[in-house]
A protein has these predicted regions:
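Short conserved beta-strand segments at catalytic cores or DNA/RNA-binding microdomains
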Residues: 13-25
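Short catalytic/ligand-binding loop motif for oxyanion handling, primarily in non-cytosolic enzymes
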Residues: 13-14, 60-63, 145
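Acidic, Mg2+-coordinating catalytic module of metal-dependent nucleases/exonucleases
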Residues: 102-167
Length: 177
């Protein structure tokens, strides 16, 4: 089963700034605004059977569909690992879940808000800002595989369980940090 892990970074207006994909068989690839290409993105996913995200059904994939014109959920099986986490009583954003499971991160302290700040720092020409943003996104996509392995869902396809945490309705903000 060939799988890919997808994560995006955005600015405060939810415009894509970085799109990252990790394929265990090919490594990571990232696209930075304005150099997005629907063709390149889908070409990199060619041969993939399953795409995994964290909160991707509500955040990443709708933005990719709207802004890149790539409907990932109609082209590939999608598994949102956030739902698997909920089924295992692991709640919170990706970084919080990683910490609970002992998944290491070199970009400790960088979160979604900091990613927005890094994007603006890059746009102002600050040295190193884009590099740190790309390392952060790369860790996101690579750590999704570590998360899937810890959850034991790597060989599974199709949607994750749809169990919502007790007392939580729809989350309208991004549950990633």
């Amino acid at each position: 089963l060939i799988r890919a892990y997808v994560d995006v970074e955005t600015d405060e207006m939810k415009a894509l700034t970085v799109v990252g994909v990790f394929r265990p068989d090919r490594g990571a690839k990232q696209w930075v605004r304005p150099n997005f290409s629907r063709f390149d993105f889908l070409n990199f996913l060619s041969g993939v059977e399953s795409v995994m995200t964290y909160n991707g059904a509500r955040f990443d994939l709708p933005l990719i569909k709207e802004q890149l014109g790539a409907d990932v959920e109609s082209l590939f099986r999608h598994r949102d690992l956030m739902l698997d986490c909920w089924a295992n009583n692991l709640y919170g954003g990706l970084k919080k879940v990683e910490a609970q499971l002992g998944i290491h991160r070199d970009t400790e302290g960088v979160d979604g808000l900091q990613a927005i700040r890094l994007w603006h720092a890059h746009r102002r020409g600050e040295t190193g800002a884009l590099d740190l943003l790309l390392r952060y996104n790369r860790e996101d996509v690579e750590n999704l595989e570590a998360l899937a392995l810890k959850l034991g869902v790597v060989g599974k396809v199709g949607p994750a369980p749809a169990r919502r945490p007790a007392g939580q309705g729809d989350v309208h903000e991004r549950a990633r940090t």
